[in-house]
Amino acid sequence: MESRLTEREEMVRWQIEARGVKNPRVLQAMRSVPRHLFVPEPYAREAYQDYPLPIGNDQTISQPYIVAVMTELLSPEKGDLILEIGTGSGYQAAILVACGASVISIERIPAVADLAKRNLTRAGIRNVLVLCQDGTQGYAEKAPYNGILITAATPALPEPLLEELADGGRLVAPVGDRDIQELTRVTRNKDEYHTERFGAVRFVPLIGMYGWKKEW
């Protein structure tokens, strides 16, 4: 147990904080969530290294630095309601909860949704509702959302998600073509949307009605 705590602290210090992530809430969340419980057992020893790892079904858990950056761009606060598109392992949702948010997370692959539920339960993470459906269509039942986080590559920002963003809310997503995307943040001000871009990234595809029609 002590070694895992040390690994997490080293991960935050050298992979995240040293590379410019400063939000105290995000740093504490990254220190507190046991990432090794969200990766397959064969990769548990690599859980705190700064690279993505496979979780099955051609999906991955993002590298810790990218998780921290996307969370900082979203800047979740205590009491926020966050919509996550692409649950994956459940790790990103756990980080959002550790920041004080409640999360609705949508995953399109049933086996991956089940994996995330098991991982979240094993890690003792509550305040996450995992749904299995097309996340590009949003989830109007609980809208509007203080933040929306898309954890897969989208060719454009899905219109339903923009509509479900609360006034003052932020949407963070990798937007671009099949080879490379730009990490993008959109902030809503009533009926206007302010867009900022934060550099190149590469993610697995966002499949759905308002995403890519098929994987590549």
Curated annotation (Swiss-Prot):
Alphabetical keyword list: Cytoplasm, Methyltransferase, S-adenosyl-L-methionine, Transferase
Active site: 62
UniProt GO molecular function: protein-L-isoaspartate (D-aspartate) O-methyltransferase activity
GO cellular component: cytoplasm
GO BP term (any one): protein modification process
Record EC number: 2.1.1.77
InterPro entries registered for this protein in UniProt: PCMT, SAM-dependent_MTases_sf
Record flagged with keyword S-adenosyl-L-methionine: yes
Catalytic activity: [protein]-L-isoaspartate + S-adenosyl-L-methionine = [protein]-L-isoaspartate alpha-methyl ester + S-adenosyl-L-homocysteine
Family: Belongs to the methyltransferase superfamily. L-isoaspartyl/D-aspartyl protein methyltransferase family.
Entry function: Catalyzes the methyl esterification of L-isoaspartyl residues in peptides and proteins that result from spontaneous decomposition of normal L-aspartyl and L-asparaginyl residues. It plays a role in the repair and/or degradation of damaged proteins.
Protein name: Protein-L-isoaspartate O-methyltransferase
Native source organism of the sequence: Methanospirillum hungatei JF-1 (strain ATCC 27890 / DSM 864 / NBRC 100397 / JF-1)
Organism taxonomic ancestry: Archaea, Methanobacteriati, Methanobacteriota, Stenosarchaea group, Methanomicrobia
Annotated gene: pcm
